C-alpha cells in the first residue's frame, strides 16, 4: 500500500501538471470505485491476493485524490493573500478534515457492516463515490493545475533545493510516527494491555479523529509564524516525546503507570505531530511553483509515502527484536534527524 503511494505521488504529480488536476482527481475517484467493485465478487472468490490487489488500487486512488486536492488549493486561494494566511488555513482544514473523516470511517464502516452487511456496505460506498465523481466531472475546472508548458517525464524529480530539504524532513517526520504507531503500538495494546480488536481499533480511530481536529486548527496554534523557525521548533518539541514515553515505560512498581504514560503520551504526541503535519503541508504548497504545482507537491508526498513505508517495515522488525521501547527510541532519533534537516531550510521559508 505504501509502496504504491511512493510511485503514485511521483507519477501523479507529473500527470497533474501535464493533463490537469481535474483529470487526476477524477481518475482517483474512478479507481476507488473499481477497487470497491473488486470486493463485490462472491465471498469464495475473495482470496488474499485479490483483496491485496484491491487494497493497492485503493491506495493509488487515495494518493491521486490527496495530491490533486492539495495541489489545487494553491490555485484556488485568491491572489493577494497577505502572509499566506488564507492558504495556511485552507491547507490545514483540508488536511485535518481528511484525517478526521478517516477516523469517522472506521465507525461508519462498522455501522454499515452491521446494518446492511459486507456487500451492501461496499455497494453503498461505490454508489456514493459515483455521485461524487459525477459532480466532479460537471463542476471541476478543466484546466485546474495544468502547466502552461507540458513538463517532460524527466522533470518529476524536484530541482528546488528548498523542496528537496523539506521533502527529506517530511520523510523522517512520518517515518518517526509510523515506526511505533503502525505495527508496534496496536500489537502492544493487544498483548500487554489485553485489549481486544475492537477496543484497539476504536481507540486508534478516535485518536485519528482528534489528530485531524488539531490539524484543522493548527493555524490558530502556531499563529502567523508558519515558516522555517516554526517547523524547527515544533519538530524539536516532538522529538522529546517518544523518548520520554520510553523512559516512563521503564518505571517499575506501579501497575497503572504504563497505561497513563503510553496513552497520555500518545495523545500528546498526536497533538504535537498534527501541528507539525499541517505546518509542513502548508509549507510545501506555499513553496511549490505556481505553474505545474503538482510536480512539486507530488514529489513531496512521494517522500511522505517513502517515510511511511520505511517506518512500517521498521515498526514490525524493531518490535520483534526490541519491543515497543526500541521503536520509541528510533522514533526520537528520526525526529532529531528531521530537526537537523529542517535547519538547512532557507531562512525566508
Label every model-predicted segment:
Residues 8-21, 113, 213-229, 319:
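Helix-to-loop junctions at the C-terminal end of transmembrane segments
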Residues 30-45, 237-255:
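C-terminal ends and interior cores of transmembrane alpha-helices
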Residues 35, 46-65, 258-275:
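Hydrophobic core of transmembrane alpha-helices in multi-pass small-molecule transporters
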Residues 54-98:
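Cytoplasmic helix-loop-helix junction between adjacent transmembrane helices
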Residues 120-138, 326-344:
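Symmetry-related core transmembrane helices of the 12-TM Major Facilitator Superfamily/SLC fold
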Residues 137-176, 191:
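Juxtamembrane intracellular "pre-TM" segments in multi-pass secondary transporters
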Residues 183-200:
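Short amphipathic helix-loop junctions that connect adjacent transmembrane helices
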